[in-house]
Design a protein with these regions (language model features):
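Rossmann-like AdoMet
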Residues: 1-84, 88-144
């Protein structure tokens, strides 16, 4: 039995059943025993990798598609560029690098990252420092704008 299992048992004994969402949040984000808070989950040292970690092409193509959509919708003066579960920030960095030559795009965007892990927020802050991203704990905190 792991320490986290003991913590979960004690919590259930004290407060009763928990939802699957609460259980998963504890397993993934517990400050001392959570998957995303205690180890690097990505790449060679982690358990999995994603397309943006292998090649910048996906992020760059996505960025150009987003910029074209922004232009096609009249280039709104403000819009939110959000990513849910941004990992190390690699995808967003690729998107932003590919779009830096699109006049007005970066000036109009607000970069918001939906991330619950403090450790990953620190990694994302380093990767995206020039763009001053802000963070939200869940998608319900995203701004009401395009």
């Amino acid at each position: 039995m792991t320490e986290l299992a003991d913590i979960l048992r004690a919590r259930i004994a004290a407060t009763g059943p928990m939802t699957v969402a609460e259980y998963m949040a504890e397993c993934l984000l517990h400050p001392l025993h959570g998957y995303y808070t205690t180890r690097p989950p990505f790449g060679a040292e982690g358990d999995f990798t994603t397309a943006p970690e292998i090649s910048q092409m996906f992020g760059e193509l996505l960025g150009l598609c987003l910029a074209q959509h922004w232009l096609d919708t009249g280039a709104p003066a403000r819009f939110t560029l959000a990513e849910l579960g941004p990992g190390r920030g690699t995808l967003m960095a690729d998107v932003l690098r590919a779009t830096r030559g699109v006049p007005g795009f970066h000036a109009a965007m607000e970069v918001v990252l939906v991330e619950a892990s403090p450790r990953l927020r620190d990694v994302q802050a380093q990767a995206l420092a020039p763009y001053a991203p802000r963070w939200a704990d869940d998608a319900g905190q995203l701004p009401e704008q395009p």
